[in-house]
């Protein structure tokens, strides 16, 4: 028996609510897991994985879920209020990422190791730079009068698309980090696979949210 359009809509919304809640829990759980594993303060390097997971797993995920119709924790706020919270969370994520990048550079300098010698390092640098550009672009949406010649709808579309790319770059950096000697020496077996699933799950949820909010809607418009 075929489901009615209304029933399918309710099921789809319920699935998005569940997946959004899962993204909140996974983003927080992964960050706590990395913090416990790294024991921040035990060494200079120990702050790097903590700050990067805080930036690209927790803060950036929460910054994007702010706009989720089903799972936002700030649904009571106006669109403008959520946009400002989004920008603050993104800025905090950028600051954490910059600090994490700076500390690992200092750590490598102390050990006399080469910089950007791995795909993890290159992806991480690219993700941090992209996040910086994305935060700068967000200023144009907070204050659209700064860009009077650009239609606001197009600015939102470009910002959302670019933000999704930046988020996926951050997720890729985390995945590559879990292939590093430091991580694989401590985390093995099924726990490693569960850890790898964390950024994959949050990335899929964010991709679905952005695609439905901007990309798919724009594609079906005449």
UniProtKB/Swiss-Prot annotation:
One Pfam entry for this protein is Cytochrom_B561
Recorded GO molecular functions are: heme binding; metal ion binding; transmembrane ascorbate ferrireductase activity; transmembrane monodehydroascorbate reductase activity
Instruction: Report the subcellular localization.
Output: Endoplasmic reticulum membrane; Cytoplasmic vesicle membrane
InterPro entries, alphabetically? CYB561D1/2, Cyt_b561/ferric_Rdtase_TM
Specify which residues bind heme b 1 according to the UniProt entry for this protein.
48, 120
Q: Which CDD domains match?
A: Cyt_b561_CYB561D2_like (cd08761)
Query: For this UniProt entry, what is the primary localization, expressed as one broad class?
Result: endoplasmic reticulum
Q: Which residues lie on this side of the membrane: Lumenal?
A: 39-46, 107-122, 184-186
Task: Kindly list the biological process annotations in GO that this record carries.
Answer: ascorbate homeostasis
Keyword Magnesium set for record? no
Catalyzed reactions: monodehydro-L-ascorbate radical(out) + L-ascorbate(in) = monodehydro-L-ascorbate radical(in) + L-ascorbate(out); Fe(3+)(out) + L-ascorbate(in) = monodehydro-L-ascorbate radical(in) + Fe(2+)(out) + H(+)
Q: Which cofactor does the UniProt annotation name?
A: heme b
Give the record's membrane topology. Answer: Multi-pass membrane protein
What does the cofactor section's free text say about binding?
Binds 2 heme b groups non-covalently.
EC class of this enzyme? translocase
Q: Name the Gene3D superfamilies on file.
A: 1.20.120.1770
List membrane-spanning regions.
18-38, 47-67, 86-106, 123-143, 163-183, 187-207
So what EC number does this one have? 7.2.1.3
Q: Which residues form the Cytochrome b561 domain?
A: 14-217
In UniProt terms, what function does this protein have? Answer: Transmembrane reductase that may use ascorbate as an electron donor in the cytoplasm and transfer electrons across endoplasmic reticulum membranes to reduce monodehydro-L-ascorbate radical and iron cations Fe(3+) in the lumen of that compartment.
Protein name, per record = Transmembrane reductase CYB561D2
Species name for this entry? Answer: Bos taurus (Bovine)
Its ancestry begins with: Eukaryota, Metazoa, Chordata, Craniata, Vertebrata
């Amino acid at each position: 028996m075929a489901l009615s359009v209304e029933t399918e809509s309710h099921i789809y919304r319920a699935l998005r609510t569940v997946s959004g809640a899962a993204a909140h829990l996974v983003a927080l759980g992964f960050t706590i897991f990395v913090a416990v594993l790294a024991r921040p303060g035990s060494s200079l390097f120990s702050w790097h994985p903590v700050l990067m997971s805080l930036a690209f797993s927790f803060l950036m995920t929460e910054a994007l879920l702010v706009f989720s119709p089903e799972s936002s924790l700030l649904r009571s706020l106006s669109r403008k209020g959520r946009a400002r919270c989004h920008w603050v969370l993104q800025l905090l994520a950028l600051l954490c990422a910059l600090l994490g990048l700076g500390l690992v550079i200092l750590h490598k300098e102390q050990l006399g190791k080469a910089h950007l010698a791995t795909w993890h390092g290159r992806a991480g640098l690219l993700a941090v730079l992209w996040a910086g550009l994305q935060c700068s672009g967000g200023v144009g949406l907070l204050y659209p009068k700064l860009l009077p010649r650009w239609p606001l709808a197009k600015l939102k579309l470009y910002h959302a698309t670019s933000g999704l790319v930046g988020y996926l770059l951050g997720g890729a950096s985390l995945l590559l980090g879990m292939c590093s000697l430091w991580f694989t020496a401590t985390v093995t077996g099924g726990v490693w696979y569960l850890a790898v699933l964390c950024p994959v799950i949050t990335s899929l949820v964010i991709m679905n949210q952005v695609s439905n909010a901007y990309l798919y809607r724009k594609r079906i418009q005449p």
